[in-house]
Amino acid sequence: MSGGGDATVSAELIAARKRLQAAGVADPLVDARLLIADVTGFSLTDFVMKPEHPVTQDESARIAAMIERRAEGEPVHRILGHREFHGLDLLLSKETLEPRPDTEVLVDTLLPALKEAVSRKGSARILDLGTGTGAICLALLKECAQASGIGSDISADALETAAKNAARNGLDSRFETIRSNWFEKISGRFDIIVSNPPYIRTDIVATLDPEVRNHDPMAALDGGQDGLAPYRLIAADAGRFLVENGTVGVEIGFDQRLDVSAIFASHGFSLLDAVKDYGGNDRVLTFRR
């Protein structure tokens, strides 16, 4: 990557940052460090303490290939094949949405209800609809050892990835996957039903940032003509699968709070909480009936 005869981490970092900056990448230094660290095993401290550490020809070639993919618009965590979420290291795959930091707000909002259920009964069950990587359910399980969960998804690829993520994070004994179109194959009752469904209007999807629309699965983005179709399905059936005083939690688009609240209200649910994300946008709603 560096083009010099004696490649060092410092030289690789300078060259990688320059290439990404020229390509218009928003955080060229951050992304360059992440990709180089993946190849070399460096920590952030190592970049400061060991800048002259030698890089082999093979490592340099791998770094160059990854930097080029990033320069061409592939998201850095897609290149790495994994991403941190709520303290978990999660694998990504073709048919999984890349977990975003704002979705951690959904996890944190539901934790008190989950722990309350455990304190009352000694255990609790979670259903994560459209589980993808398993991020939401697994993060809740990590924080509550007495809980168990089911991740459902229509995608076999996503379910395989979620199962791998459960195993790599030591949560597989309390997590199972079911291939289901929403509630179609679900049975039993749950203390928490949670979902980060596709909520972007069909006509908006084509205008999304290329890093999103070209690399996240369309099925995880497109929420139908008005972006509300998944919420109608969830609200219509969730009551049949909730225990008494169970909680439904959903992630929403920044402008959907009133519409989604009205949909759930029409099915007898009361709004418990409306929470904003780190950017100050409406992002999470919880309901009970």
From Swiss-Prot:
GO molecular function annotations of the record: nucleic acid binding; protein-(glutamine-N5) methyltransferase activity; protein-glutamine N-methyltransferase activity
Pfam families: MTS (PF05175), PrmC_N (PF17827)
E.C. number: 2.1.1.297
Keyword Transferase: yes
Residues the entry annotates as binding substrate: N196, P197, P198, Y199
Matching InterPro entries: DNA_methylase_N6_adenine_CS, HemK-like, N5-glutamine_MTase, PrmC_N, RF_methyltr_PrmC, SAM-dependent_MTases_sf, Small_mtfrase_dom
Residues engaged in binding S-adenosyl-L-methionine: G130, T131, G132, T133, G134, D153, W182, N196
UniProtKB keywords: Methyltransferase, S-adenosyl-L-methionine, Transferase
Gene3D superfamilies: DNA helicase RuvA subunit, C-terminal domain (1.10.8.10), Vaccinia Virus protein VP39 (3.40.50.150)
Reaction catalyzed: L-glutaminyl-[peptide chain release factor] + S-adenosyl-L-methionine = N(5)-methyl-L-glutaminyl-[peptide chain release factor] + S-adenosyl-L-homocysteine + H(+)
SUPFAM superfamilies: S-adenosyl-L-methionine-dependent methyltransferases
GO biological process: methylation
NCBIfam families xrefs: hemK_fam (TIGR00536), RF_mod_PrmC (TIGR03534)
Function: Methylates the class 1 translation termination release factors RF1/PrfA and RF2/PrfB on the glutamine residue of the universally conserved GGQ motif.
Family in the record: Belongs to the protein N5-glutamine methyltransferase family. PrmC subfamily.
UniProt-recorded name of the protein: Release factor glutamine methyltransferase
Organism per entry: Agrobacterium fabrum (strain C58 / ATCC 33970) (Agrobacterium tumefaciens (strain C58))
Lineage: Bacteria, Pseudomonadati, Pseudomonadota, Alphaproteobacteria, Hyphomicrobiales
Name of encoding gene: prmC
